[in-house]
């Protein structure tokens, strides 16, 4: 489905969003097929294609739970930010300012700008109101995710663009890419961002968090500026209890956990995926004025974090292996490496579910 966005004025019209409760009762929706015309003319406005997914926009009172989506979403557009079409694309929702819980996407997804396996953008600004946070809890993506813009693509296995909101218990198995290559290097200069969980967060405050998440999909952007196994570009959101085992390729700011880190925290995390980048940093491609805690890279490399303009990397380690006890109570030991303990993940069965009840910090 899609929602029309009236672009006259700042923010989204609340009456265009879904504000009900959709409970899939554990069923799958098969054969979902969404395809738009291919737009590539600069200055054209096709706002009816802006938000694509099972739901176009989930509003602040909306809940979608207990459903699996199978199919394909191909929101076609090519060019840069002046192509007003196919921008917010996700398997469950184009934009989510409500709650998505216990949902899985198996659909392959293509869009121009902000593209995620679950939602293109998390959080929103509605007209006449403050910023509204969205929440994702116990979500999984298995489909491929592709963003095609040459200047501002943000692709994530779970979320393309994190504006305001929390992600708790999230898994990405799908390949994520922003494959655009261009001779004039728009993608390098403007910051194409790709991540296993989130492409990029945009808020310098009140952004939210990523907690209990992992990626094992392949992540790549050959000419893009930011690649991270968890998040490509991290300005503000806090990250705890995460790991990456997927391989990745990036051009400039690239790392197995975070490509570019300007704010927020990251702690209790490890990477065992191979990072292919000319900078060769395995955990964080660039970090400025932030502190990290208890990070591990499994492998031979000793180039772990590119530290710029301050920060503390005293608890960053290159190791042969890691145990759950080295990380936090959020992990449990498995056959090879620690995995996140999913035994307490909310299931979405309780209609009176309280989001505040899962505000878990530091694995406690």
Pin down the residues of each PLM region.
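Surface-exposed repetitive/solenoidal architectures
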Residues: 1-364
